């Protein structure tokens, strides 16, 4: 009987009930796959207000598995989850860099999310439980000032390393009710402006409240929110809902995860 209850408690419905009742909540889904997978964070790109974005990434498959001739794909989405660009990169170096400007995105001045996936036809050194996750560093420069870099913050999507074109989400788990409160460990006093970047890495609508204002973020949408208070608490129905922070002081820009 205990084994049956435990099994039911770990199903998708069981986890949803646990999270909604705040009974042994689960923040991340355990990925039970019989093939090696590539996981990507939901990275932010910005080309609005004089911004450009720089992305630094590694050839993970060669670095750790000595697999040659692998490649990566970048998938760029608008803030409303519209696919706007896919780019395949072959001939990887150990360390690589991509600059994302408005020109790169067909003169689009906005913001959104992008994902990076590692693919290979060579499976010699991989087993079916391997998970490739390139957390990477993303830099942001406004008006050609110095870049401020931050590493990956939110696990977003995953796919087979064999490039089968099926992309799955819901690594981060939600609940039915807004039961979860996260207070950012930062005092926002002394800055000219502060922005929080949110992305929804799930297939469910995330409902959240900041500074007594209610928001709804549809699946895989993203949103920039300017804040005014010195201490910020986020109440939501997502168990891991952590924004990227942009803090401005004169010409100084500080970007970091919360």
Regions found by a protein language model. Give the residues of each.
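Gly/Pro-rich, tryptophan- and cysteine-flecked surface segments typical
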Residues: 1-258
């Amino acid at each position: 009987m205990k084994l049956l209850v435990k099994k039911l408690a770990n199903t998708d419905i069981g986890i949803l009930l646990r999270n909604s009742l705040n009974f042994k909540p689960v923040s991340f889904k355990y990925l039970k796959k019989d093939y090696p997978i590539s996981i990507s964070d939901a990275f932010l790109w910005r080309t609005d207000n004089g911004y450009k974005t720089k992305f630094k990434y590694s050839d993970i498959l060669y670095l750790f598995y000595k697999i040659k001739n692998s490649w990566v794909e970048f998938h760029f989405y608008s803030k409303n989850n519209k696919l706007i660009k896919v780019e395949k990169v072959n001939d990887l170096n150990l360390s690589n860099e991509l600059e994302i400007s408005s020109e790169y995105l067909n003169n689009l001045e906005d913001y959104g999310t992008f994902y990076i996936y590692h693919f290979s036809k060579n499976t010699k050194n991989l087993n079916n439980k391997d998970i490739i996750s390139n957390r990477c560093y993303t830099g942001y420069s406004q008006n050609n000032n110095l870049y401020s870099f931050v590493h990956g913050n939110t696990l977003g999507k995953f796919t087979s390393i064999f490039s089968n074109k099926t992309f799955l989400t819901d690594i981060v788990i939600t609940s039915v009710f807004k039961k979860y409160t996260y207070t950012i460990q930062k005092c926002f006093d002394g800055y000219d402006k502060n922005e929080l970047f949110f992305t929804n890495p799930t297939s469910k609508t995330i409902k959240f409240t900041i500074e007594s204002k209610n928001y709804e973020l549809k699946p895989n949408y993203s949103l920039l929110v300017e804040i005014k208070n010195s201490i910020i608490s986020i109440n939501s129905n997502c168990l891991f809902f952590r924004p990227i922070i942009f803090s401005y002081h004169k010409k100084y820009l500080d970007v970091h995860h919360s």
